[in-house]
Curated annotation (Swiss-Prot):
Enzyme Commission numbers on file: 2.1.1.166
Presence of the UniProt keyword Transferase in the record: yes
Active site: 179 (proton acceptor)
The protein's name: Ribosomal RNA large subunit methyltransferase E
Name of the gene this protein is made from: rlmE
Keyword S-adenosyl-L-methionine annotated: yes
Record-linked Pfam families: FtsJ (PF01728)
Organism the protein comes from: Nitrobacter winogradskyi (strain ATCC 25391 / DSM 10237 / CIP 104748 / NCIMB 11846 / Nb-255)
């Protein structure tokens, strides 16, 4: 082990056996990531929890009594934070976590194994919530192919689908937050969001790795969706 420029001990993983270089680098990054260690100490399911904590500390979009939908929720780091902030465990607010993968139970969170891309998904969700959501969150990322342009289009397409779903389940004045990656492929997405929301901005929490193009689009002040205009 050696110290890095911050004075912290840096763990180096030896390459041996069948371990690939990519696996070695990923393991080293995890072992030396302070957010990974802090998440374990604080009981969060993933380091991603700190991204939502930081964004909400600054912008205050999660409030007691709100109803929150977490798309692609597994393993549940964002659902944990949302449940705590809206008071779901005390019955003040509600958090609905949606994913195709099973997810261990979280106190105060209702889990739905559901494909949000299915045409019937908005109606099923609205029936579960008995009303519209105040906030829709998405920390999803599309499966990558290794081809940069293809991956960018896949990621933007996923967020566009999440935004379309949101327009069916979000109440006027609500908030939509989704993970995106910095590229020139999201122009259409921004046009869509600026049409449907009063304010649209990009944010990059400190917990997002600095060498990553990851950032979040935050859309606030929902103008009302297709259901409201029928």
């Amino acid at each position: 082990m050696a110290k890095d420029t911050t004075g912290r001990l840096h763990v180096t993983v030896k390459t041996g056996g069948k371990r690939k270089l990519s696996s070695k680098l990923w393991l080293e990054r995890q072992l030396n990531d302070p957010y990974v260690a802090q998440a374990k100490r604080d009981g969060w399911r993933s380091r991603a929890s700190f991204k939502l904590i930081e964004m909400d500390d600054k912008h205050r979009f999660l409030k007691p009594g709100m109803t929150v939908v977490d798309l692609g929720a597994a393993p549940g780091g964002w659902s944990q934070v949302a449940a705590k902030r809206v008071g779901a465990a005390e019955g003040k607010g509600r958090v609905i976590a949606i994913d195709l993968l099973e997810m261990p139970e979280i106190v105060g969170v209702t889990f739905a194994r559901l494909d949000f891309l299915d045409d019937s998904a908005p109606d099923k969700l609205l029936a579960m919530m008995d009303g519209a959501a105040d906030v829709v969150l998405s920390d999803m990322a599309a499966n990558t192919t290794g081809h940069r342009k293809t991956d960018q289009l896949r990621i933007v397409g996923l967020v566009e689908s999440a935004a379309a779903f949101t327009s069916d389940v979000l109440r006027p004045g609500g908030t939509f937050i989704a993970k995106v990656f910095q590229s020139g492929a999201d122009a259409g997405l921004l046009v869509q969001l600026k049409r449907d929301f009063q304010t649209v901005r990009h944010v990059k929490p400190a917990a997002s790795r600095q060498d990553s193009s990851e950032r979040y689009v935050m859309a606030t002040g929902f103008r009302g969706g297709r259901r409201d205009k029928c």
